[in-house]
Amino acid sequence: MHYTTLLLSTLLVGTALAQPTNPPAKTPKKAPKTQPYNPCKPQEVIDTKCMGPKDCLYPNPDSCTTYIQCVPLDEVGNAKPVVKPCPKGLQWNDNVGKKWCDYPNLSTCPVKTPQPKPKKGGVGGKKASVGHPGY
């Protein structure tokens, strides 16, 4: 019995020593995934099953010309947010009772005022003078 155990141990150690010792392949590190924006409210999904024409629809904080529709996944309120486009020229209107794509002047999308680009060459587009005019 001892001879068999000794022989088996010797074979296992010998096999382990005979294996090539290649360094493990480097796997690139991936940045952790951030959770995508999900406005789907479990209670609304449970209550409405998102079946009504205005149920489970939300504004998209990233775009005025799209909205988010929640698609139910199960009975406990989990839902998948799906970004849907508005027709060309329309924006999302999230007013109670509406929740549809509407003309921009009727949309509830926050208006983003474009910031003016700074002009090159100093203040107001003119080069700053080096000396004081009285000297």
UniProtKB/Swiss-Prot annotation:
Domain Chitin-binding type-2, first and last residues per copy: 47-111
What the entry lists under Pfam families is as follows: CBM_14
Under InterPro entries, the record lists: Chitin-bd_dom, Chitin-bd_dom_sf
A single cellular component GO annotation: extracellular region
Propeptide ranges are 19-29
Which stretches does the entry tag as region Disordered?
19-39, 112-135
Q: Name one GO biological process term.
A: effector-mediated suppression of host innate immune response
Question: Which cysteines in this chain are paired by disulphide bridges?
Answer: C86-C101
Keyword list, A-Z: Chitin-binding, Disulfide bond, Signal, Virulence
Gene Ontology molecular function: chitin binding; PAMP receptor decoy activity
Query: Signal peptide position in this chain?
Result: 1-18
What the protein does?
This necrosis-inducing peptide induces a hypersensitive response on Cf-4 tomato genotypes. Race-specific elicitors are compounds which only induce defense responses in genotypes of host plants which are resistant to the pathogenic race that produces the elicitor, but not in susceptible genotypes.
Name of this chain's protein = Race-specific elicitor A4
User: What organism is listed for this UniProt entry?
Assistant: Passalora fulva
